[in-house]
């Protein structure tokens, strides 16, 4: 399992962070080997080899998630931390200039779904933002991640530093997701 971090240079390229590459040229998430061991059918998606289904099949898994809960590997999505250039300041006011969602008011470990905007206020992409102290954790869509990170880095030069993460990311979805989380990770369910 890989877990790496790198600074984004603002040119549209990430230096230092990488995903394992398969023989077919598609990237692999840190959970790739586990998916194979569990019998997943892998398909190309957003430049990655991703699991499309397991034994229940697409419809069975869909219904199970809608009725109960399903766990998804979303490690292909763009993940980054945003740090203030001045470690004694808060990065939220700087980042809030790029999104319509209230980031300054975000509570510790609070999450906000919002949109990344261009200089004219047009929407470039949607993203999730989580506050950790004076830093922010960002999750953006896989297909747009390099463009999103370039826009953020270029817009915040001298104000913030973007550090791209390459690690596993899971999404637990469905009406029983909270109960499943409480059963297996009680502290995380709060």
Which residue ranges define each predicted feature?
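Basic, glycine/lysine-rich polyanion-binding surfaces/domains
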Residues: 2-190
């Amino acid at each position: 399992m890989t877990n790496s971090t790198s600074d984004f240079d603002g040119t549209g390229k990430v230096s230092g962070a990488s995903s394992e590459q398969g023989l077919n040229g598609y990237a692999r998430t840190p959970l790739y080997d586990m998916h194979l061991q569990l019998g997943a059918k892998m398909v190309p998606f957003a430049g990655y080899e991703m699991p499309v289904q397991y034994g229940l099949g697409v419809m069975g898994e869909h219904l199970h998630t809608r009725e109960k809960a399903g766990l998804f590997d979303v490690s292909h999505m763009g993940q980054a931390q945003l740090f203030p250039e001045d470690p004694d300041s808060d990065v939220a006011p700087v980042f809030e200039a790029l999104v319509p969602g209230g980031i300054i008011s975000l509570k510790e470990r609070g999450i906000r779904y919002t949109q990344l905007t261009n200089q004219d206020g047009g929407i470039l992409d949607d993203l999730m933002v989580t506050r950790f102290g004076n830093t922010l954790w960002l999750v953006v869509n896989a297909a747009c991640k390099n463009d999103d990170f370039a826009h953020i880095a270029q817009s915040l030069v001298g104000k913030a530093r973007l550090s791209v993460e390459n690690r596993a990311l899971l999404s637990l979805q469905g009406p029983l997701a909270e109960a499943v989380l409480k059963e297996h990770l009680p502290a995380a369910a709060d």
